């Protein structure tokens, strides 16, 4: 037993853990080259070819949006121009390094929250999770977002407002979903005296909801919050204005507006997909698409008020709810909340049996969805109804998992000092 503990201790040392994780991901990248050249099913993500083509257009002095289906900020194509000048593997190795940087940030955040002894273990859960390993090595850019989101949490937790706000503005520019974190971040800054002192306690005890709401608005106008919102807003606005100046309306349309009206009728776990598919030619389809955001907004608002004191947990719930109830839900979106899961796990008071059952349920629900999706994609059979039913089951299981996590989580609101 002691020998096994010694082996685990060695394994969890950073000088062993990080090089091993890098080696495994690099091996997957090289295997991907072999598979792409020799097998019918390709390893490299289709989006990676889109990124590379967009980067090539940039090197020719034209817009990256000349590449059909490029729906991202030009900044990503700029970052990947070494794909053209150096090697096509550059982007994959960059995403692999972002995976490792995300793990490092997970470790730092956990240590700052007072979880020193087991921080390396939870860090390893991300490093050796096969899903992020495969996603980054296939050339998907989600690990970049993971680094940005974790960096925001790291700096906000340490009350480094300027750095946190700059990265937050950049993260919203890269992908719009982190904008949902603004309310819990604002409430987190006021967590020590959110309801006030004695007056606040009297308000709560008397259930004066109007006064609570007024108090909330007053505290949301504090110096720290206004500074964070201003810096992040200016960062986002400057990036947006710069790229709008360079690429015009097609930048706004492809980077932001497209995602408000997007419909993915095949590779989509969303419970809304079948409704949006059937009403695609309806005059009210745009309104229905916008209405799909309403349940998300309500749930995110409630979660913000309930769990803002534990910011990583609140952001995890935000992201899990956003992805589960989104009108478009693909497997790469799962990484948006999986990168936050190691920050939540130390507070879970759940039996191992229960945890394993939830993991099995999560994978089982995806397998159920993949069967009709395969017959639709590769056999050309009409399985839309079955895919929708599987999507409803996936939503149900995700909801059960979220409820179980909330029920078995012990809130952590460790006070952090300004630095």
Swiss-Prot record:
Domain of life: Eukaryota
Record's bilayer topology term: Multi-pass membrane protein
Sequence ranges on the Cytoplasmic membrane side: 1-13, 112-114, 190-224, 307-327, 377-382
UniProt KW keywords: Endoplasmic reticulum, Glycosyltransferase, GPI-anchor biosynthesis, Membrane, Transferase, Transmembrane, Transmembrane helix
GO molecular function: glycolipid 1,4-alpha-mannosyltransferase activity
Subcellular location(s) of the protein: Endoplasmic reticulum membrane
E.C. numbers: 2.4.1.-
Residues passing through the membrane, by range: 14-34, 89-111, 115-135, 169-189, 225-245, 286-306, 328-348, 356-376, 383-403
InterPro entries: PIG-M
Annotated GO biological process: GPI anchor biosynthetic process
Pathway: Glycolipid biosynthesis; glycosylphosphatidylinositol-anchor biosynthesis
Topological domain spans for side Lumenal: 35-88, 136-168, 246-285, 349-355, 404-419
Pfam family, one: Mannosyl_trans
Transmembrane listed as a keyword: yes
Gene Ontology terms: cellular component: endoplasmic reticulum membrane; glycosylphosphatidylinositol-mannosyltransferase I complex
Function: Catalytic subunit of the glycosylphosphatidylinositol-mannosyltransferase I complex which catalyzes the transfer of the first mannose, via an alpha-1,4 bond from a dolichol-phosphate-mannose (Dol-P-Man) to the glucosaminyl acyl phosphatidylinositol (GlcN-(acyl)PI) intermediate to generate alpha-D-Man-(1->4)-alpha-D-GlcN-(1->6)-(1-radyl,2-acyl-sn-glycero-3-phospho)-2-acyl-inositol and participates in the sixth step of the glycosylphosphatidylinositol-anchor biosynthesis.
Family, similarity comment: Belongs to the PIGM family.
Subunit composition and interactions: Part of the glycosylphosphatidylinositol-mannosyltransferase I complex that is composed of PIGM and PIGX.
Protein name in UniProt: GPI alpha-1,4-mannosyltransferase I, catalytic subunit
Organism in which the protein naturally occurs: Xenopus tropicalis
């Amino acid at each position: 037993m002691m020998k096994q503990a010694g082996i685990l201790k060695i394994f969890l040392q950073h000088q062993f853990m990080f090089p091993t994780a890098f080696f495994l991901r690099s091996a997957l990248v090289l295997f991907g080259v072999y598979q792409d050249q020799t097998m019918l099913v390709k390893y490299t993500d289709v989006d990676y070819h889109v990124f590379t083509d967009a980067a090539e257009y940039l090197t020719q002095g034209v817009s990256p949006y000349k590449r059909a289906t490029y729906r991202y900020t030009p900044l990503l194509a700029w970052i990947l121009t070494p794909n053209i000048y150096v090697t096509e593997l550059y982007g994959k190795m960059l995403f692999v390094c972002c995976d490792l940087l995300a793990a490092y940030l997970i470790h730092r955040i956990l240590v700052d929250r007072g979880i020193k002894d087991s921080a390396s273990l939870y860090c390893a859960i991300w490093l050796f999770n096969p899903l992020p390993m495969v996603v980054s090595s296939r050339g998907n850019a989600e690990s970049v977002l993971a680094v940005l989101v974790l960096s925001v949490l790291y700096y906000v937790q340490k009350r480094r407002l300027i750095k946190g706000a700059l990265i937050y503005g950049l993260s919203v520019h890269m992908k719009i979903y982190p904008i949902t974190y603004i309310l819990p971040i604002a409430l987190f800054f006021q967590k020590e005296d959110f309801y006030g002192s004695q007056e606040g306690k009297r308000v709560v005890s008397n259930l004066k909801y109007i006064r609570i709401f007024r108090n909330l608005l007053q505290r949301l106008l504090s110096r720290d919050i206004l500074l964070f919102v201003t810096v992040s807003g200016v960062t986002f606005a400057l990036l947006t204005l710069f790229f709008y100046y360079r690429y015009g309306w097609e930048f706004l349309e492809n980077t932001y507006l497209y995602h408000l009206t997007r419909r993915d009728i095949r590779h989509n776990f969303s419970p809304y997909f079948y409704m949006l598919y059937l009403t695609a030619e309806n005059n009210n389809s745009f309104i229905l698409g916008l209405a799909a955001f309403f349940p998300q907004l309500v749930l995110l608002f409630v979660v913000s008020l309930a769990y803002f004191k534990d910011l990583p947990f609140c952001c995890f719930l935000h992201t899990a709810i956003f992805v589960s109830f989104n009108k478009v839900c693909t497997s790469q979106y799962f990484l948006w909340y999986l990168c936050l899961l190691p920050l939540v796990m130390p507070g879970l008071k759940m039996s191992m049996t229960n945890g394993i059952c939830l993991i099995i349920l999560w994978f089982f629900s995806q397998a159920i969805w993949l069967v009709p999706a395969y017959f639709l994609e590769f056999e050309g059979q009409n399985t839309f109804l079955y895919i929708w039913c599987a999507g409803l089951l996936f939503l149900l299981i995700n909801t059960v998992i979220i409820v179980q996590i909330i029920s078995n989580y012990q809130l952590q609101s460790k006070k952090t000092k300004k630095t």
